[in-house]
Amino acid sequence: MAIDRIIASPAVRVTETLDLFQPAAGIDAIEPDWDRRIYLASSATLIDVIRDIGKDAQNLLIAGHNPGLEDLILELVPESPDDELRAKVEEKLPTSALARLELDIADWRDLDTKSARFVAFIRPRDLDASLSPAMDDD
């Protein structure tokens, strides 16, 4: 999967995250489209932002904020008792997590709820166990 477009909130935390993520992911040549609508956006607003892309991108990266992103994922991926990745998002979409979804659409204007499937979900603690929440042994 080659990301060909990035749409991001212009919030400082997002810009700092992308400054680190883009070179590490080999996508530092892509200039993000900074979209103020993403800041504090509901899932409905995020769907509108995505639909506005039309056919201008095949593989899209959205960098934004919760609860909107978590709600968006849960709206796009249908519930399934066997979907462990969706269950992890239902538990929590932590800061700096990455969710990869696939959709069978050629035009982002065709985006609809319950139309995506999980391919990957990576939390910071999946990459570095020291980032896991503290657990009590008592």
What is each residue range found by the language model?
Residues 1-58:
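Phosphate-coordination/substrate-recognition cap region in phosphate-metabolizing enzymes
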Residues 3-25, 103-138:
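Conserved histidine-centered catalytic loops in small-molecule metabolism enzymes
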Residues 57-79:
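A glycine-rich beta-strand to alpha-helix segment
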Residues 77-119:
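Domain-level recognition of soluble alpha/beta enzyme cores
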Residues 11-15, 66-67, 95:
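Alpha-helix N-cap/helix-start capping motif
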Residues 33, 61, 100:
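Conserved beta-strand segments that form the floor/walls of ligand-binding pockets within enzyme
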